[in-house]
Amino acid sequence: MQQLRSAIHNAIARFLKNQPPARIIAVGFALLILLGAALLMLPFAVHPGAHVSPLDALFTATSAVCVTGLVVVDTGDTFSLFGQAVIAILIQIGGLGVASIGMGLALVAGRRISLKGRSLVREALNVESLEGMVRLVRAILLMTLICEVAGAALSFPSFARDHMPLQAVWLSIFHSIAAFNNAGFDALGGGQSLIPYQNDLLLNLVTDALVIVGGIGFMVILDVGRCRGQFRRMTFHTKVVLSTTAVLLVGGAVLLHLTDHMGWLAALFQSMTARTAGFSSVDVGSISNAGLLVIMILMFIGASPGSTGGGIKTTTFFVLMQQVRSIFSKRRLGGFHRRLPDGSLSRAATIMLMGLMVVGCGTFALCVLEPQLDFGRLLFEQISAYSTAGLSTGITAELCPASRVVLILTMFIGRVGAVTLLSLWVERPAPSAQYTEENITIG
């Protein structure tokens, strides 16, 4: 038995050694989803009398691991405490990343971190250097623990007013994990998300803070701490993320206030949660078409690199907007007295184009499969799945099995990254002869 175990371990080690980090991460997410689905299908994972089909379990596990929040069955009404705990763990691992959690467990066990392990974490966190990777993971795990414990403690008074003490404790923990990891799950039951708490100032502000901190990226948080909040000392990346986040947050709130006459607290909350969090303090299905368009744009842009959120990312949006500005101002691409590298625009454009292609193909498939549903609602659902936002106009549970599979694939692509997945399985062509350059008319 020991020899068999050693042989299997060596075979896995040899296999992983020859695989690029991004492929290992993608496979790791897929295996975690399958494991989560299997656990959610256990009889004691659901309430007595409730039933979860294999597809529903797979959808829920995918939504949790990809920190989305779209659901086909209500989390609180369907899943038992065990099932909800499984979902919370999947959210936590999915938000921080399989590689980061794996390194954290290895550090706790006192094991040495290999170069391959450090490369996996670098790929997962989207950082440039391998230097200080162990210290970085320790800081991220500690920061996550502090934020989630503080969030749970501050959320408790709001939930304690409507629930028994022990249940309020669990709801606070579950909500804090979901909010920090930008996953729109709630265990309240009734399918209302946070609508009953739309006027609860404390819970709204705590949720806002958790979502924003989780969505701006771990490197940004550490840089803000290093600079003690002094904006001029921060890195170019941090300045871009913070300024773009502020513009989107305030701009989205103003537009939602104007289009749907939301109160400022609700508009601010909805603008924040649209960018990949998935919570809702208003009925999304009742929002006007103009308001839905604002939310779709915010969802598509999403969070920031190296964070728990999805979308094309705030930095991509910044680069594209700077390119538009540079066309009219005739200035070089950049900002904050810094010039962007030449490859930044092509990468941003590729990410944007791939995102539009995934959303377009997915929406087309949903339109074919669900001809009875409104195009705008199907587009909203697809963007929500791709950006791992988790907001819905209320049609998720009505979708046919094939449509649910489309959303499962979209959520997975959105979490791992369309460009990353494409680069893993598309072989690079061998260098060919250089051809003569010639212009074409564009626009």
Residue ranges and their predicted role:
Residues M1-G443:
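Membrane-proximal intracellular helices of multi-pass ion channels
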